[in-house]
Design a protein with these regions (language model features):
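Short beta-strand scaffold segments in enzyme catalytic cores
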Residues: 167-171, 224-226, 301-307
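CN hydrolase (nitrilase-like) catalytic-core segments centered on the catalytic cysteine
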Residues: 96, 102-104, 112-136, 211-217, ...
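Soluble catalytic regions of membrane-associated enzymes that act on cell-envelope
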Residues: 42-190, 227-232, 237, 241, ...
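Internal/C-terminal transmembrane anchor helices
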Residues: 19-47
C-alpha cells in the first residue's frame, strides 16, 4: 500500500512537471520502502533468543503413496512401519512422536478402539518409553441405528443405519485416558459435501480424495488441546487444512497450547506446488502465534520463526527430530 501511494504520487508529479529528478527520487523511495523493512527483519531474526522450556519431538515422514499404498495396508502393518522407522531413535528424553494425518487409515470403530489391537500395540511402544506421548492420525467410524442420533454431518448407510466419519488425531501416553480431536475445518467437496442429495447423484466420486474416504466428516465446535503425561506440554493437534486458517489456529493458543503440531497428508499433491504452499502456511501460523510447530508430513518441520530448522527431503522415508 505504501509503495502504491509513493508511485502514484510520483507519477502525478512527473506528469505535471516532466522532471526526471522525480523519477530518481521515486526509485530511491521505492528502494528504501522495500529494503529497509527487509534489513530490519534480518537484524531482528539474527538477534532472536529462544526462551522457555524445550520439547523433544520426533516427526514421522513415512513417504506412503496415498494413491497406491495407503489403503492397501492394515493399521497393524503401519504400526510395524512405525516401529521400523523409530527403532533406536526414541529415547527416554523423547517427549512426542508425531505421525501424519490418517496414518492409520483403516477405519476403526470408535467404541472398540480402547480394546483394539492397534491401541495395544501403541501402548506397548509407550510402555518402553514412559515419558513418550504419541500424536497420530486415525480414521474413526461410529456406526449407529438410532435415527435420533443422526446429525447434519452424519452419513446414511442404508434405511436403518447411520455413521459418523471422523478424521481424528489421538494422544496415547502412559495415562489411561485417550484424548481425541476431530478435524473441524474440512475440505469442501471432499470431506464436507454440501447438498449431498442434489450433487452426489450428479458428481458421484469424481472429486479427488485429499484426506481419506469421500464422505461427510463429523467435526467438533472447540479446539481441543493434548496435554503431555507430565503436564508440562500442551500441544495443538492441527489437522491438515486447518493450518490454512490463522484465526482458527489461534483458537488453540487461546486454549493454552504452548506449541503446535500439524499432521497432514500433503503427499496427495504429488509433484505439484500444493504441498510447498501448504508448508508456507505453516510458517505463517508460527509467526502469527509465536509458537514452535512440529509438522509430520512430506515436508517436515517449520519452527516459530521465518526459516526451517530441520527439513526432510520430499518423498523420502525418514524421521525428523
Amino acid at each position: 500500500m505504501l509503495l502504491n501511494c509513493i508511485i502514484f504520487s510520483a507519477i502525478l508529479k512527473f506528469k505535471t512537471n516532466r522532471n526526471k529528478r522525480i523519477l530518481k527520487f521515486l526509485l530511491l523511495k521505492c528502494s528504501l520502502a522495500i529494503l529497509l523493512p527487509i534489513g530490519i527483519s534480518f537484524i531482528i531474526l539474527n538477534n532472536v533468543s529462544y526462551s522457555g522450556e524445550s520439547v523433544n519431538v520426533i516427526a514421522l515422514q513415512p513417504n506412503i503413496d496415498p494413491y497406491s499404498e495407503k489403503y492397501n495396508m492394515t493399521n497393524l502393518k503401519f504400526v510395524d512401519l512405525l516401529e521400523k522407522l523409530t527403532y533406536n531413535k526414541i529415547t527416554d528424553s523423547t517427549d512426542f512422536l508425531i505421525t501424519p494425518e490418517t496414518y492409520f487409515a483403516e477405519s476403526v470403530r470408535l467404541p472398540k478402539f480402547r480394546t483394539s489391537q492397534l491401541r495395544t500395540r501403541l501402548d506397548a511402544i509407550v510402555g518402553k518409553h514412559p515419558n513418550l506421548n504419541i500424536i497420530t492420525g486415525v480414521s474413526f467410524l461410529d456406526v449407529f441405528r438410532d435415527k435420533n442420533r443422526a446429525g447434519p454431518e452424519s452419513n446414511q448407510y442404508d434405511a436403518v443405519t447411520w455413521y459418523n466419519d471422523y478424521n481424528s488425531a489421538v494422544l496415547i501416553n502412559k495415562t489411561d485416558n485417550i484424548a481425541q480431536y476431530n478435524k473441524s475445518k474440512l475440505v469442501v467437496g471432499i470431506e464436507n459435501f454440501p447438498y449431498q442429495s442434489v450433487l452426489k447423484p450428479i458428481l458421484g466420486d469424481a472429486l479427488i480424495d485429499l484426506g481419506g474416504t469421500v464422505a461427510m466428516k463429523t467435526t467438533q465446535d472447540y479446539r481441543g488441546i493434548f496435554t503431555s503425561s507430565n503436564g508440562n506440554y500442551k500441544a495443538a493437534p492441527i489437522i491438515c487444512y486447518e493450518s490454512v486458517y490463522g484465526e482458527f489456529v489461534t483458537g488453540y493458543v487461546r486454549n493454552d497450547a504452548n506449541f503446535l503440531t500439524i499432521i497432514t497428508n500433503d503427499a496427495w499433491w504429488n509433484e505439484t506446488q500444493g504441498h510447498q504452499q501448504h508448508l508456507s502456511y505453516a510458517k505463517l501460523r508460527a509467526i502469527e502465534t509465536r509458537r514452535d510447530i512440529a509438522r509430520s508430513s512430506a515436508s517436515a518441520w517449520p519452527p516459530g520463526c521465518t526459516s526451517l530448522r530441520t527439513r526432510s527431503p520430499t518423498w523420502r522415508s525418514r524421521l525428523t527430530a
